[in-house]
């Protein structure tokens, strides 16, 4: 579920007529984004100009997003990403704002990871990794975490990329943005086919 606002009504009518939207705000309820449970997005989109050309549907001057992912949502997401064993691997998530780490605690393991900006998205860089009763190479676990976070935070359209990430007492907050982005045609990206 999401809510959107376009400004006050008289100005909105003018924006629709001119196909130039100066300020759009969107906020999700915080239930889920992609496969990430407990994730909320607050978007501010500025200077949208709709104009059909062979290569685009128009342009977006600026898009800024604040993405909040709760500790409980991180736990549920990791559990869902590892069917059957998920609850054993991650039974709780504890955040440590002082050192910017997230601790994934399970019956069989304890992983301390630091969320970082990597490429255009985010990664959880393993700081400490302990297992009980079995041995897994740290590289294997790191690779699995990278695939998981990549599927959630990379490959956004419009050149949207991660700018920063911060661990808070309740989860993780990240900032994503793009500037002067061309809106793809429906053929280039089906998500934009009805613009």
Region spans (language model):
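Hydrophobic residues embedded in beta-strands of well-ordered beta-sheets
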Residues: 100-102, 122, 172-173
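Extracytoplasmic/luminal low-complexity segments enriched in Pro/Gly and acidic/polar residues
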Residues: 136-195
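N-terminal beta-strand/beta-hairpin edge segment
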Residues: 2-84, 92, 97-101
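Beta-strand elements of well-folded, non-transmembrane domains
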Residues: 8-10, 30-32, 45-49, 69-73, ...
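A structural signal for short hydrophobic beta-strand segments in well-ordered beta-sheet cores
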Residues: 93-94, 113-117, 164-165
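Extended amphipathic ligand-handling, pore-lining, and cofactor/metal-binding catalytic surfaces
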Residues: 77-89, 96, 118-161
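Residues that act as N-cap/strand-start positions at coil-to-secondary-structure junctions
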Residues: 98, 107-109, 159
